[in-house]
UniProtKB/Swiss-Prot annotation:
Name of protein: Transcriptional regulatory protein HptR
Residues covered by the Response regulatory domain: 3-118
Keyword presence, Protein biosynthesis: no
Single GO BP term: phosphorelay signal transduction system
Keywords: Cytoplasm, DNA-binding, Phosphoprotein, Transcription, Transcription regulation, Two-component regulatory system
GO CC annotation: cytoplasm
HTH araC/xylS-type domain sequence ranges: 153-250
InterPro entries in UniProt: CheY-like_superfamily, Homeodomain-like_sf, HptR, HTH_AraC, Sig_transdc_resp-reg_receiver
Organism superkingdom: Bacteria
Modified residues (4-aspartylphosphate): 55
Entry PTM: Phosphorylated by HptS.
Length: 252
């Protein structure tokens, strides 16, 4: 769901953070690494990560220069520093970085920071989704936060966690102790649409948040769980009565 760029000129540090931290537990499924600020800036501009973890002292472009370059971008920054980097750290304060970590990095402390960050990111995503949903009739069934049926709530939660994958109804209900026919009937009774319909509407809703982030449309299709672009385009037109390209033109 989220992306992170890890920048440090010491390979053992950047690869250690990539391998040791259970990123998936914090909804980060794409991890990029860079050995200096120049590489990091290129990755950040190309992939627009939600989080950047960067060392301060690096060759070619140091961490403070990198912060200056990405000051206007919507990403969170964690600075890695040594005890003698205080002057560099002060320079970073003006950029409102998320946090500072001393080397060697305390992985438990980093995970605490990630936990706080992901709660904020998920809440922002939820608010953005509700705002978009309220503007389109097709997404009205997605606005309800909770249903009065345990199994329905479990399925909705599973959809929100799994929509980016090629998930099936069987996959969505495998963790609840009911038959597929019962789950499908109960879901339709409470929500008013089928499980598959809800899943596809949710995927299209999430795609709207990606359309203004410079992704190619086939990339968006893949990111929200459609196996091929033509299926994404079909469902987009089905729910919004226009193509993704027309939607982008209208939004400008």
């Amino acid at each position: 769901m989220f992306k992170v760029v890890i920048c440090d000129d010491e390979r053992i540090i950047r690869e250690g953070l990539k391998q040791i931290i259970p990123w998936g537990d914090y909804h980060f499924n794409t991890i990029y690494t860079a050995k200096d600020g120049v590489e990091a800036l290129s990755l950040i501009q190309q992939h627009q990560p939600e989080l950047v973890i960067t060392d301060i002292r690096m060759p070619r472009k140091n961490g403070v220069d990198l912060l200056n370059d990405i000051a206007l971008l919507d990403c969170n920054v964690i600075i890695l520093s040594s005890y003698d980097d205080f002057e560099y750290m002060k320079a970073g304060i003006q950029h409102h970085v998320l946090d500072y970590l001393l080397k060697p990095v305390d992985h438990a402390q980093l995970e605490v920071i990630l936990g706080r960050l992901v709660r904020t990111l998920l809440e922002q995503q939820s608010q953005n989704g509700r705002s978009l949903a309220s503007c389109h009739d097709a997404f009205q069934p997605l606005l309800k936060v909770e249903y009065d049926d345990y199994y329905v709530n479990q399925i909705v939660d599973q959809i929100k966690q799994s929509y980016q994958t090629k998930v099936t109804v069987s996959d969505l209900i495998q963790h609840i102790d009911v038959s597929e026919s019962y789950a499908m009937r109960t879901f339709k009774d409470h929500v008013g649409i089928t499980i598959v319909d809800y899943l596809n509407r949710y995927r299209i809703l999430q795609s709207l948040q990606l359309l203004d982030r410079h992704y190619k449309h086939y990339e968006i299709a893949d990111k929200v769980g459609f196996s091929e672009y033509k299926m994404f385009s079909y469902h987009f037109k089905k729910y919004l009565q226009m193509s993704p390209s027309d939607y982008c033109k209208q939004a400008k």
